[in-house]
């Protein structure tokens, strides 16, 4: 059994397999998941686990080089935006429709129980050296 880091075996495997510039998505419970993109569904009930908690925990175990967010998060969800800003990496903003198109390229979408608008982020893998 692991002593530290993410205990979820699916998430641990995805993070270990990422290459530079690969992407994963952390999503609220309403984001559509494109056909062909792997899903790790953590949602237990509305709000659990939260977007903020999952972003914090995953980013703590991942080399994140950049994030992509929907522009709409700025006005609609300052709490989720603040959680992502704490990662202290460059941010790219696109429309929500463009964001959904970008999710088609993700290695995986991690679905949280979050039920607030635009609580979605694309994490771009960096390197550890």
Curated annotation (Swiss-Prot):
Q: A GO term (biological process) for this protein?
A: D-ribose catabolic process
Question: What reaction gets catalysed by this protein?
Answer: beta-D-ribopyranose = beta-D-ribofuranose
Keyword check for Chloroplast: no
Taxonomy, superkingdom: Bacteria
> GO CC annotations?
cytosol
Per UniProt, where does substrate bind? 28, 96, 118-120
EC id: 5.4.99.62
- Sorted alphabetically, which Pfam families does this protein's record hold? RbsD_FucU
Q: Sorted alphabetically, which keywords does the UniProt record give?
A: Carbohydrate metabolism, Cytoplasm, Isomerase
Give the positions the UniProt entry annotates as the active site. Answer: 20 (proton donor)
Report the GO molecular function annotations: D-ribose pyranase activity; intramolecular lyase activity; monosaccharide binding
Q: In which pathway does it act?
A: Carbohydrate metabolism; D-ribose degradation; D-ribose 5-phosphate from beta-D-ribopyranose: step 1/2
Q: Which family does it belong to?
A: Belongs to the RbsD / FucU family. RbsD subfamily.
The UniProt function text for this chain reads: Catalyzes the interconversion of beta-pyran and beta-furan forms of D-ribose.
Q: Which HAMAP family match?
A: D_rib_pyranase
Subunit and partners:
Homodecamer.
Q: What is this protein called?
A: D-ribose pyranase
Please give the organism.
Answer: Exiguobacterium sibiricum (strain DSM 17290 / CCUG 55495 / CIP 109462 / JCM 13490 / 255-15)
The taxonomic lineage of its organism, from the top, reads: Bacteria, Bacillati, Bacillota, Bacilli, Bacillales
Gene name tied to this protein: rbsD
């Amino acid at each position: 059994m692991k002593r530290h880091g993410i205990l979820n075996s699916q998430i641990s495997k995805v993070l270990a397999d990422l290459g530079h510039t690969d992407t994963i998505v952390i999503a609220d419970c309403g984001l559509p998941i494109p056909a062909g993109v792997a899903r790790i569904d953590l949602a237990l009930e509305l709000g659990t686990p939260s977007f903020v908690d999952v972003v914090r925990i995953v980013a703590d175990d991942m080399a994140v080089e950049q994030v992509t967010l929907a522009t709409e998060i700025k006005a609609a969800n300052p709490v989720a935006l603040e959680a992502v800003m704490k990662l202290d990496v460059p941010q790219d903003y696109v429309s929500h429709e463009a964001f959904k198109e970008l999710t088609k390229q993700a290695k995986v979408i991690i679905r949280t129980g979050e039920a607030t608008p635009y609580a979605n982020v694309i994490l771009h893998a960096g390197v550890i050296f």
